[in-house]
Curated annotation (Swiss-Prot):
Pathway: Amino-acid biosynthesis; L-arginine biosynthesis; L-arginine from L-ornithine and carbamoyl phosphate: step 3/3. InterPro entries: Arg_succ_lyase_C, Argininosuccinate_lyase, Fumarase/histidase_N, Fumarate_lyase_CS, Fumarate_lyase_fam, Fumarate_lyase_N, L-Aspartase-like. It comes from the Bacteria. It is found in: Cytoplasm. SUPFAM superfamilies: L-aspartase-like. PANTHER family: ARGININOSUCCINATE LYASE. This is Argininosuccinate lyase. Keywords: Amino-acid biosynthesis, Arginine biosynthesis, Cytoplasm, Lyase. It catalyses: 2-(N(omega)-L-arginino)succinate = fumarate + L-arginine. HAMAP family: Arg_succ_lyase.
Length: 464
């Protein structure tokens, strides 16, 4: 280690310079550089407040604002050099400010610590990302309503335990995903409300003795208010964990959709045709059309879940207040945001180019005793207790399996061997169309209910 005295902005207490290996290991500028515009905006608001409170002069404020603007312009132009020796985005910008305007620049950090400064930058960045995620979720929801409108009235099998269960409208299935992503949207907005409190002015962890005005800075930066406890503010990363939890849920929903698209596109199902532009081929098998984009979306769920686990594990044992461990919060969040944003965008695009094979979907409802529940409901309407009706239909299904036929293939006489209350009107309820149209309960797959739900969804996404 060199004997040279530290030249860091915080280096007054140190007699030796930081080792190069330590500098490389501890730097964060390689990734927190994306926060630069928030750091500059926060510094401008902070400087303005310091001037208003008489802590710096109007002339110094003017120099600081001009210096920060010139730094931002250089960053935007790609000519600003970020250096690992200055560790992070804050120190790079502050050092550049001091280099450009001299003593006035060294007055900017009064009543501020990097602890509350990074929390400010991070929250402002996440706030913007929440707004962007809402736009992407709206786009995904819009895609589901467009597909739903296109195939309104078409029927496919619904599944439980990956076995054919009951017939449903394709639109009903698409609206199920619409509901998932609307909940995701609500969660993001709810998360945004909680993170929209300014931490600036809490300083390192105990507040400051200087006569600052936290509310002025919060208002200038668009925050709803200020945080209430300086120790909690310095220690807090709930907002990062909460948002990443929301992102994990979004990617989970995307993964479930992707899994269905992969399955439905197989030769065994043939329910959907994913556009060639969202598939790839094989390097050895000429016939292959692989649903790689859907598979990648499904696969990326692992890295988003990993980001959440990383954050939770990093925070679980930290005493109050700030610890350097918290520097490790940003990369997982950045990666989760980037991954989910890209996945949402390409999912909406892929859905817009996907086609359902409606004939094949309808054909799949003709086997697997998919209207067995309808027969049980029919018996209930004939005053047969449901458990008895369930047993009767189960016996009929077993007989059909032995005979190698489906329920609609039985004659009325054969039906009546299982229950004498069965009449000729039974065959109307054993069709997929009859089954779907009977599901008129709120939230059900009946055409009337689905049309109502689709119209409401279209209104919510701005189509109708």
């Amino acid at each position: 280690m060199t004997e040279q005295k530290s030249k860091k902005l915080w280096g007054g207490r140190f007699s030796e310079a930081m080792a190069a290996s330590v500098e490389k290991f501890s730097e964060s500028i390689s990734y927190d550089v994306r926060l630069y515009k928030y750091d500059i905006a926060g510094s401008k608001a902070h400087a303005t407040m310091l001037s208003s409170q008489g802590i710096i002069s109007p002339e110094e404020l003017e120099q600081i604002i001009a210096g920060l603007s010139s730094i931002e312009a250089d960053i935007e132009a790609g000519v600003f050099e970020f250096k690992t020796e200055y560790e992070d985005v804050h120190m790079n910008i502050e050092q550049a400010l001091v280099d450009r305007i001299g003593a006035a620049g060294s007055r900017l950090h009064a009543a501020r610590s990097r602890n509350d400064q990074i929390a400010l930058d991070f929250k402002m960045y996440l706030r913007d990302q929440c707004d962007h995620l809402v736009e992407l979720l709206d786009g995904a929801c819009r895609a589901f309503t467009v597909v739903g409108r296109k195939y309104l009235g078409d029927i496919m099998p619904g599944y439980t335990h990956t076995q054919r269960a009951q017939p449903v409208l394709i639109t009903h299935h698409m609206l199920a995903y619409y509901e998932m992503f609307r909940r995701d949207r609500d969660r993001i907005l709810d998360c945004r409300k909680r993170l929209n409190l300014s931490p600036l002015g809490c300083a390192a962890m105990a507040g400051t003795g200087l006569p600052i005005n936290r509310e002025q800075v919060a208002k200038a930066l668009g925050f709803a208010g200020v945080t209430a406890n300086s120790m909690d503010t310095s220690a807090d990363r709930d907002y990062a964990i909460e948002l990443t939890s929301c992102l994990t849920m979004i990617q989970l929903h995307l993964s479930r959709l992707a899994e269905e698209l992969v399955t439905w596109s197989t030769s065994e199902y043939k329910f959907v045709d994913i556009s060639d532009s969202f598939c790839t081929g094989s390097s050895i098998m000429p016939q292959k059309k692989n649903p790689d984009i859907a598979e990648l979306i499904r696969g990326k769920s692992g890295r988003v879940v990993g980001s959440l686990i990383s954050l939770i594990t990093m925070m679980k044992g930290l005493p109050l207040t700030y610890n350097r461990d918290q520097q490790e919060d940003k990369e997982p969040v950045f990666d989760a945001i980037d991954t989910v944003s890209a996945s949402l965008s390409i999912t909406a695009e892929m859905m817009a180019h996907m086609k359902f094979n409606t004939a094949r979907c309808a054909e799949a409802t003709e086997t697997g005793f998919i209207t067995a529940t309808d027969l049980a409901d029919y018996l209930v309407m004939k005053d047969v207790p449901f458990r008895q009706a369930h047993h009767i239909v189960g016996s009929a299904v077993a007989a059909c399996i032995a005979k190698g036929c489906e329920l609609p293939d039985l004659t009325l006489t054969e039906m009546q061997e299982f229950s004498p209350v069965i009449e000729s009107d039974v065959f109307a309820v054993l069709t997929a169309e009859g089954s779907v149209n009977s599901r008129v309960s709120t939230g059900g797959t009946g055409l009337v209910r689905v049309t109502e739900a689709l119209t409401l969804a279209e209104k919510c996404v701005g189509i109708a």
